[in-house]
Design a protein with these regions (language model features):
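Acidic, metal-coordinating catalytic segment for phosphate/diphosphate chemistry
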Residues: 1-42
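Residue-level structural signal for beta-strand termini and adjacent loop
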Residues: 26, 57, 134-135
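Short, solvent-exposed loop/turn elements at beta->coil junctions and helix N-caps
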Residues: 27-31, 103-109
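A short local loop/turn or secondary-structure capping micro-motif enriched for an aromatic residue
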Residues: 29-32, 59-64, 139
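A glycine-rich, hydrophobic loop/mini-helix early in the fold
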Residues: 38-71
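The catalytic Nudix box helix
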Residues: 53, 68-103
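Nudix hydrolase/Nudix homology domain
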Residues: 64-67, 77, 104, 111-181
């Protein structure tokens, strides 16, 4: 028992104000739907005015087998949001010039979870960096392609909630910048 507890992911439990009030094993939290409020980080990747999305996989706890950002993770107990962003991005998180920028914090809730989502965005400027991010199950999506598929089960529940905000902020600004180039 003790060995399995050491390997367990420990998640902070938040109050409704977003303050840490304790911790719980991820496996226990998942067995009690929506009972605990946990922080997560998500990183949107934008390249040439398009969003890069990958398949979440069939075993994903929320929105399995749907398209979503390549970087997302729980914030572990006693870890900062910023360190979680770096860890989630792997070797890309080591380069300061590639660090994503914080965009918005919101509460995501469905029948299984309640999460405090910290959404970041990374605007990739070079093909070399994009090649390091690419995964076999990933694809660049235009805003139009996304709009045509919203609500059809193609995208994760998180993404469905975030897209309008992204479209009216970062993607809009990115398209203005592209037009001036």
């Amino acid at each position: 028992m003790q060995g399995s507890l050491r390997k367990e992911m420990w998640l902070p439990v938040l109050n409704d104000g977003g303050k840490v009030i304790g911790c719980i094993a991820r496996s226990v939290s998942r067995s009690l739907p929506k009972k605990y409020y946990h922080p997560v980080v998500r990183v949107a990747v934008i390249y040439q005015g398009m969003l890069y999305l990958v398949n979440r996989g069939k075993k994903a706890f929320v929105s399995p087998d749907t398209m979503d950002y390549p970087f997302h993770s729980y914030v572990l107990f006693r870890h900062s949001i910023e360190s979680t962003v770096r860890e989630t991005m792997g070797s890309l998180g080591e380069k300061e010039e590639l660090m994503p920028r914080f965009l918005i914090r919101y509460t995501f809730e469905n029948e299984r979870v309640k999460h405090l989502v910290n959404l970041y965005v990374m605007c990739v400027r070079s093909e070399e960096v994009m090649d390091r991010i690419k995964q076999p199950n990933g694809k660049l999506w235009t805003s139009r392609q996304i709009e045509e598929n919203l609500g059809s089960g193609v995208f994760s529940e998180y993404f469905e909630q975030e897209f309008a905000y992204l479209q009216n902020t970062v993607l809009l600004a990115e398209n203005f910048c592209k037009a001036d180039c």
